[in-house]
């Protein structure tokens, strides 16, 4: 079977280790925290010596344990709390090498906590471990994904909508500074997937777009920024999850492209990541028939893909990590022996085994494979050495604890918070304005307050002149809360109505009554990819999180039937939703449901900021990649309507 040959950057890969390539000095970068000394990723002689010495002293039991990474969900835990006892006991009993920081979940809710709570818990876990733990996290939008009080950034697609890769570099730097402050060393980001399938239920706005070169540019920029501030990076989900129609958290996804397609679309961003010095590559639970014809071999367990393609053909020398081993895309194949999934993943060439479905079974299966000779001691040593050197490269051989006294100086610096908001502002993309309503125009009976932003003027309050309908993913979440605050700060009598899949049908009469006399309507669609989550529809079916529920879709269509020309639809996430609602006349993409994107969308709709974003993806039948209607700040509906490539 022919393999992808990597020539263009072979010399770079030889001269500069994929794991320890130093970041370049870029003094002109946006958002750089000049007052904070940056710590680079570097494996010095002392670190290498520590790794060698530590490895020589380790037993097979300890070495096997270093391969595993387990959840730690941030919350305050007393030392005697059963959750803390179980977590610390697992670290000691199984000698785990790393933990993945997340937060508890309650249905659709992520129970986020504060940075101090995270840092304090991670310090206690470090104390419980014989060897220093490397702490990883999914900070795809910065720490704000998991923790309150941190710098907020939008989803990846918003960055590419700005057209400026330096924004991704600033994001990498700022999120790295904050992560290292709380004791997190390794981010499972950037996402190198090319979102070429509009129906993709799990990647979508997590990707930088549909163009392999643009995705590669932003991937490389993020890596540079993160490395400048000492954060390990991960390119995911190899060999590409962007052209799939199944969430691998819920089922078995397939990448059906041939060799030519893989080489032209899926692989180039990973090549860019490797040449940029990415520290790790995460392998996806997807089948790729063009690379491995065995239907029971997902990429994670395929030696042809992990060792043959990634390591040998593409020359990657860094750490290879699995996607979570508890995902349905893998557990359904190994339902009768989940421990075997760990063994097969390791034999394929992975170094780190993340979130096993059953830690005890996986640990015992790996240990038995080593003792029986199925896995050689030299192969085990190879991976453990990589892991130890990775730890030393971020200084864990010298210091493993976060300095809690530094958190108030490093987290959410005003200048960094401003960078996050600026990026969200620059990402706003106007796709359609047939009704000439963007920005919203004042009328004879305009609404507002003396403090409201132009073009509204202060006049007596008149109810329902502006109606905002927030189509929430779930009313229990905070979706739409910042949008509501920003609207009411400008139009104090605006009528804000929340609906979700369970309430939309019952709310339809009151919504229709509200919009009847409205000058303008805002319909904000909160449709974002949530990995591993399926939604029960009102009709009893199941859909994914990037689709609009039937009942909410019916309500949106009813609004459009009555008031399409005066309704501004805001896509607070998935930009493709307009495909199912051709009656939309005025369409704005924010590419994220982050609070900064909510603020940016309101500022744009009210004409307070220029609209300069351009689509990073093609919306079939609607608009092509690169298109976007530009507006100057405080312009009126008669302003420029040109589409810019």
Explain the meaning of each model-derived region.
Residues 1-8:
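Bacterial N-terminal signal peptides that target proteins for export
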Residues 65-71, 97-102, 132-137, 141-143, ...:
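Structural recognition of the beta-strand scaffold that forms the well-ordered cores
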Residues 71, 90-112, 198-199, 274-297, ...:
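Short acidic, glycine-rich surface-loop motifs adjacent to enzyme active sites
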Residues 8-17:
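Bacterial N-terminal signal peptides
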Residues 54, 62-135, 139-142, 193-206:
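Short, well-ordered alpha-helical
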Residues 56-59, 83, 90, 109-129, ...:
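Second-shell residues forming the walls of enzyme active-site clefts
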Residues 23-89, 303, 312, 333-645:
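Preference for extracellular/luminal or secreted protein segments
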Residues 161-184, 191-200, 204-206, 212, ...:
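A substrate-binding/cap region within the structured catalytic cores of diverse enzymes
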